[in-house]
């Protein structure tokens, strides 16, 4: 029997969390909790790298499949990965240890409980990207809400309870219809096995309603306009590590869901509703970019920029073009790196000055130069400068959209200009200009842990900007197979 590497990736964070739950530091400094959680997350990252190295990129089918009977005659615990899902697993295992390192500076109370929540959340997120059964996917997908709800509600800002419940209710209500749809799929097809559903298809007459049910969940979690209003509040109140996990990983689960399920299971309905997705996506890109230009809170500005970036993602997915879908996946990976870095950059200055207002800063370039340089890099990556990972995804998406719908592509291109406007405006006001506050002179530059975390994010941001082949080679065959399956199902219908 082959080693269950995917189950190990899912279970290892849970084991680490249980160890933390049942042990205590005698001196109360939580050193054991810090080292155990970091060791657990680091080992998980190394396992995911081994998974990537041993993954056969020439095969389009799922690999490392584990299939075990769970509920007799109904549900199997079935997990596996293809070229699409493996990148999201690596992103998850890469971001998690960086979040754990960052909490030393940001979490002052109940640190052990916070680390337990992060590890549990990592387990659920990996499960989402591995799941090959609809019920298993749904359980992981919804379970991820619980630790994030606690992270915002316990360790968040003054309005944390309101923001936590808003986040929880929005995302939970959006998923009720998806649960009904999964039960309906089992009633229609007699299975919730994703691979079997790919092979046999779902009757065309049911697809529209089922697609809308899945859309109700994915649109809220992406989030797409107009379902995005929970996100700025959640980001503003969440602690820095919570914002990083929310932006870098949690939003990507919905984008992944659109690719894996909306396109894979409901091709006829996806063709019908593509104009809807295009419309909502371009509104998200342009409208939320304009809102970002009006923000005075740094976290809110970055939150609205996330909605705009995810608008590009949904646009690219529904082009059903090789470049469009590949661009969307790369954009999600890049956004995971860059948005994590931007929220960490906000966290750095907030820890020192206890303000997120842009007007509280200015002229800090000579005071904290290392911070200013790294902040500039991530600002340029967020606006899609060539040579950064942000450029590759946006460029491929726009190539795919131009092939499919010229007018939509032209409107979406405005988002590139607006993105440059709000990101450069943010950077100019925070870093350059006159020193508006004498207290800023007391700021100290990045400490060792902050410099390490931001450097870890800067390296792949630059590397994949100049050399995206490792990402493209990993996803190319799986994306091509998905498009062929999509087109064949349309022809057969």
Role assignments for model-derived ranges:
Residues 1-7, 15, 19-116, 195, ...:
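Transmembrane helix-loop-helix hairpins at membrane boundaries of multipass inner-membrane proteins
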Residues 30-42, 162-172, 368-372, 448-456:
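Alpha-helical transmembrane segments and their helix-start/interface "positive-inside/aromatic belt" motifs
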Residues 98-104, 123-135, 148-428:
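Hydrophobic transmembrane alpha-helices and their helix-loop junctions in integral membrane proteins
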Residues 142:
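Short phosphate-coordinating micro-motif centered on Lys-Gly-acidic
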Residues 368-370, 423-493:
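Cytoplasmic/organellar membrane-interface segments at the starts of transmembrane helices
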């Amino acid at each position: 029997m082959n080693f269950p590497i995917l189950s190990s990736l899912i279970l290892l964070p849970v084991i680490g969390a249980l160890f933390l739950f049942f042990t205590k530091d005698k001196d109360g400094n939580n050193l054991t909790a810090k080292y155990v959680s970091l060791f657990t997350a680091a080992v998980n990252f190394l396992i995911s790298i081994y998974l990537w190295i041993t993954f056969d990129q020439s095969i389009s089918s799922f690999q490392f499949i584990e299939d075990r009977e769970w509920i007799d005659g109904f549900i199997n615990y079935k997990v596996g990965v293809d070229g699409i899902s493996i990148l999201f697993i690596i992103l998850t295992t890469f971001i998690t240890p960086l979040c754990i390192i960052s909490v030393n500076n940001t979490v002052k109370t109940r640190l052990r409980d916070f680390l337990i929540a992060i590890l549990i959340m990592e387990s659920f997120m990996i499960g989402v990207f591995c799941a090959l059964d609809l019920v298993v996917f749904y359980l992981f997908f919804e379970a991820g809400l619980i630790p994030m709800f606690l992270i915002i509600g316990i360790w968040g800002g003054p309005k944390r309870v309101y923001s936590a419940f808003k986040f929880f209710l929005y995302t939970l209500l959006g998923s009720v219809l998806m649960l009904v749809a999964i039960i309906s799929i089992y009633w229609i097809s007699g299975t919730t096995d994703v691979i079997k559903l790919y092979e046999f298809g779902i009757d065309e007459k049911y697809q529209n309603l089922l697609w809308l049910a899945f859309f109700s969940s994915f649109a809220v979690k992406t989030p797409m306009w107009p379902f995005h209003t929970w996100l700025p509040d959640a980001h503003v109140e969440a602690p820095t590590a919570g914002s990083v996990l929310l932006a870098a990983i949690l939003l990507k689960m919905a984008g992944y869901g659109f690719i894996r399920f909306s396109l894979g299971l409901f091709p006829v309905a996806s063709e019908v509703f593509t104009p809807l997705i295009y419309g909502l996506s371009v509104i998200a890109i342009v409208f939320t970019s304009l809102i970002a230009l009006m923000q005075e809170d740094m976290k809110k500005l970055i939150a609205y920029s996330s909605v705009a970036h995810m608008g590009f993602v949904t646009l690219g997915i529904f082009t059903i073009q090789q470049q469009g879908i590949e661009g969307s996946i790369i954009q999600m990976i890049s956004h995971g790196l860059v948005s994590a870095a931007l929220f960490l950059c906000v966290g750095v200055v907030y820890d020192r000055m206890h303000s997120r207002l842009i007007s509280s800063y200015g002229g800090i370039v000579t005071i904290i130069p290392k911070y200013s340089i790294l902040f500039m890099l991530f600002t340029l990556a967020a606006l899609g400068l060539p040579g950064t990972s942000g450029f590759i995804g946006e460029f491929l998406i726009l190539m795919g959209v131009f092939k499919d719908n010229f007018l939509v592509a032209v409107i979406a291109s405005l988002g590139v200009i607006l993105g440059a406007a709000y990101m450069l405006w943010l950077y100019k006001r925070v870093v350059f200009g006159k020193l508006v506050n004498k207290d800023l002179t007391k700021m100290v530059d990045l400490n060792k842990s902050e410099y390490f975390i931001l450097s870890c994010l800067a390296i792949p941001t630059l590397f994949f900007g100049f050399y995206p082949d490792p990402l493209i080679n990993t996803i190319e065959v799986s994306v091509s197979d998905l498009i062929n399956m999509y087109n064949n199902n349309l022809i057969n219908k």
